Amino acid sequence: MLKSPVSHLRSNSYRERRNKKKMHLSENEGVEGNTFVVTGGLGYVGAALCLELVRRGARQVRSFDLRNSSPWSDDLRNSGVRCIQGDVTRKQDVDKALDGADCVLHLASYGMSGKEMLQFGRCDEVNINGTCNVLEAVFKHEITRLVYVSTYNVVFGGKEIINGNESLPYYPLDDHVDAYGRSKSIAEQLVLKSNGRPFKNGGKKLYTCAVRPAAIYGPGEDRHLPRIVNLAKMGLLLFKTGERSVKTDWIYVENLVLAIILASMGLLDDIPGREGEPVAAGQPYFFLRPFLRSLDYDLPKFTISVPVAVTLGNIFQGVYTVLYPWLSKSWLPQPLILPAEVYKVGVTHYFSYLKAKEELGYVPFKSSKEGMAATISYWQERKQRSLDGPTIFTWLAVILGMSSLFAAGWLPEVGPVPFLRALSLFFFRTMTMVRAVFVISVALHVGEGIYAWSLAKRVDPDNAMGWFWQTSALGFFSMRFLLKRAKDHHQA
């Protein structure tokens, strides 16, 4: 099982920093003794947030998610988090989950990357209609605090932003190249415009704010880095988009969790000296730090311009639009890149968190260097636990080569078989030799597979069968990876 994204937080160092701030009396202000609902609570950030709220003494933490399980669900239940399965697009589910809550942290969303980005209707349904359902339930149950986890895409659409801040205007809705950015922008504006709205019974008001993170990283992150690593492992990170000087924002998971909790504190209306005037009410905040990636696999050797990459992204978008009925199927791989993703990686855009620092006392819990070190360590450990192997091009070469030999040696002369037979005879002279080469190759592959299984039982027992099948298919091209792992195992 993957480790919890927030297994522990060093509260002493955090408390020392927070005591210097004037907004709150303690790190648990507004958390201790309160009931929280985290929509999207079984996700990577949502689970980390739930665990941290429990650690800070929340009376009850509810995880509200469409799924009934995730890699972190056992940790949540063992920590006392109440996991509620429901759909944010169903009013009755939302109403039931939010009943009796003191604060709602709305993280549930759809369409951030990959195939999800092309499911426009689902993006609107979850991001806009779902947020409307949350707002409606918040007013019905007179919940005074709502933190909306938005995205920097509400102000970014492919044009360079250098050290941007909260004064940037919303990116025009009609100019967004993806449904995710557009729908999140609409939802954020709905949330912020609801700030200060009184409840029907009078007296109390709803206070809202929005947090605008960028791409999230950290140990166990399950969306961005796995996709990058898988592409690198298959040898499909063929090019880099944009200039070498491009800078983009990433945020470490623990820093984002801290940001969301501080934002919820900033909506309190009973802070000494600020009664009735929550510092964060109606405000959006950026919580970001520049992030440089480092991978053990081969990095892209070529660079293409943003316009060329956008054209390539449009081609993939067109192909996958035709495949729309099957976008939710697991067997359909992720598109290599889409237009919105081109802008995210190929155009400089980074932001200042000065406003969050001044108004909420936000100081990143971990530096980019610390966060990157923890993430790399996690991926190195994960790589050691998984089956390693050659790129997809090696797979294609071996499979095509063996298939061609089999076709040349045994299949009737139809289709490409005459050409393959002529090519095989050019190298091996006789049909007997062609067939012998194929049989010997198969025998050698199976023999190597058996040896790989035997060796893996000693150095990588969890993946022994995987090594057998992969080496039986690829022979030496797989065996060399196992031999390297065996060498590392003996040196450890």
What are these regions (language model features)?
Residues 81-129, 137, 141, 157:
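NAD(P)H-binding glycine-rich loop region in Rossmannoid oxidoreductase-like domains
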Residues 253, 312, 317-325, 330-363:
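Conserved C-terminal active-site "lid" loop/helix of NAD(P)H-dependent oxidoreductases
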Residues 193-268, 291:
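NAD(P)-dependent short-chain dehydrogenase/reductase
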Residues 14-15, 24-25, 35, 348-359, ...:
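Amphipathic terminal alpha-helices
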Residues 129-182, 199-202:
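Conserved Rossmann-fold NAD(P)-dependent oxidoreductase catalytic core, especially the SDR/UDP-sugar
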Residues 34-56:
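N-terminal Rossmann NAD(P)H-binding glycine-rich loop of SDR-like oxidoreductase domains
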Residues 266-336, 373, 383-387:
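Mid/C-terminal beta-alpha module of Rossmann-like enzyme folds, strongest
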